Amino acid sequence: MKLILSTLIVFIHTLLVSALPTKEGSDPNSAKKYLVSDLPGLHENITPDNSIPLMFAGQLEIYPETDTHYFFWKFSDSNPETVTNRTIFWLNGGPGCSSMDGALLETGPFRINSQQQVISNNGSWHKMGDIIYVDQPAGTGFSYSDTYITDLDQVAEYFLKFMEKYYELFPEEIGYEIYFAGESYAGQYIPYIADAILQRNKKLVDGEHKYDLRGVLIGNGWVSPNEQSLSYLPFFKDHGLIDVHHPKWATLLAKHEQCQKIVNKIDSTFDDGVVHYYEVSSSTCEAILTDLLEYTQDTASEKDQRCVNMYDYTLRDSYPSCGMNWPYELVNVGPFLRQEKVMHQLNLINLKKWNECNGRVGRTFQARHSIPAVHLLPELAKEIPVMLFNGANDIICNSQGVLSYLQKLQWNGETGFTNKDNQISWIYDNKEVGYIIWERNISFINIYNSSHMVPYDLPDVSRALIDLITGKYDEKDVDGKKSFVTYPLGSRKESDASADGEENAGSDKVPGDSPSQTIDPMISSSTASSSSVESSLSSSTASADSDSTSSKFTRLIQLAVILVIFWGVYVLYASYKSRPSSIIKKPTNNTSNVTRSSAGKKKNVQWADQLNQFEDDERTQEPNQGIIAKAIGKITGSKDTRGRYAPVQRGNGNEYIDDIELGEGLSDPNVDEFIIGSDDDEEQGQAHSGAATHNQKQKPMN
């Protein structure tokens, strides 16, 4: 009888499931397929419900022939005060580091607590426009492919293909104003992508739409590698981290002079348009930071306080981690994203184990045939605003290095800033938070009390960068100094806004003096009749309405089927109870024992994705790397691989799990490649991998 009842229950369930209408978004081209409706802690910690952003996420196929999928996570304000048809693409660096750092540690609406639940980030950029975090190049984060790319022109090519596929999902957004933002090695990615978009816009064919690129924002960017490294010794000296009486000063000064010779050589051939090995190879200059971190150890301090944090000189860390155990909340992000339920909630089709950085991606991506992105800035500045913002406490991509390469750069008819001492105070929420130099469509913004990751330290201040680049600020005289004044979200005074409107005759200000050919970054409040929330789902609304009648009819059929089945069950049960009791015999002891023994046996069943995870966990890692082994992602290599692709290995060595953006290994001067440390907590047995991997040394790329 139990078997009959079980069979009937399964039959009922099968009928119900088969009678249900197709799940919304089952069409691979439907945006609803990528809708994210739940996450751990979402409805408990993010209140009220109308403050929960509209989210889409998933692994979007861009090149089926190589099984290349880019993971994206999009956030839109579900309750916007004003409709702004604006899209912000955010990229982290590495190369090979996931943009989920940006989403969950910096500019996204969530942070992750120690219970691996989402909590609010009140400085989220999604209040300023739709923001999309993309794991790229392929192999980074949740993105995957059969091949890895090697050069910056490929980064641009792949990202434009991603944009093409993205706008197929969200066609109503193709006319939105576009901004790119990111940090660190994204200082190489973003200029290349922006340049490719501008070139594409000049060669549109029938049926193609212009991408309305309005500006780029690069935070603590690795834009001019050798020039940046030349700033390390002056930075340490200026901030009291070393002085001329240090016993290693002469050694450091000699290396600094070697780096200066390389930079001089780069300067002499800067405009010839040729990729020179001495410019794309930066190991000599980067070795200065390695030595500085070693020589300035405070061996008398506690073990975890001996080394300067290279991402924030005001902090300390163990040696040789020197900042790899930071940011501290990173230990929550990995376990959160590795939860299988979270992977399903993010609509993953490949349940790939997330790691902050993938060393194989970084080592394959050598950029040997790509001129550093600093060469692209002048052309970009002819058409769009270029904003370079820096946390003042950062060492590895410090402000001195940025100003140094800008002062040599020629753009829009002049060299450098004509008066870099003419600094504009930046006032946010009645406090001076930094200073601005803005001329001819390139701006430099130095932000006080912040690190390599400005939005991590000052999320609300960083969000106001969007106000600066879009002209949503007030110019005032504060304490006798020219100041740009921005405000917390929604608190800009009506009188100030009105005065600003009169002064600018209805248009937004453009900071600095833009050339005549510059596209002004005018981002006005849209008068569109629907919000981005509504438009994101508009493509599916019609089909949902057309299905409403059939859905009601289907439910009636379901109800009828259920009633018939329950009636049948009742008849069987009544027939069973009416049988003579003498027919029903108790089993013998032997039979009972056999039955119990048989019933007590259970099959050990594992899901396929569990087996995949076990295979991932059993993969061995490469030998440990050199001293910083995690600090600056170098754009180097030895083999001519332009336009070629590196196949992804299967089995052992498929995934190289690594740590923070901008890793480097400089222990061997003959080795010139990207090196970073492991971030896989489970495989390395560390709460955070930086301290576990400082002795790793990378083999040269073949």
UniProtKB/Swiss-Prot annotation:
It comes from the Eukaryota. It holds the Pfam family Peptidase_S10. GO terms for molecular function: serine-type carboxypeptidase activity. It is a single-pass type I membrane protein. GO terms for cellular component: membrane; trans-Golgi network. Residues 491-548, 582-603, 660-702 are annotated as: Disordered. The keyword Membrane applies. Glycans are attached at N85, N122, N441, N449. Protease with a carboxypeptidase B-like function involved in the C-terminal processing of the lysine and arginine residues from protein precursors. Promotes cell fusion and is involved in the programmed cell death. This is Pheromone-processing carboxypeptidase KEX1. It comes from Candida albicans (strain SC5314 / ATCC MYA-2876) (Yeast).
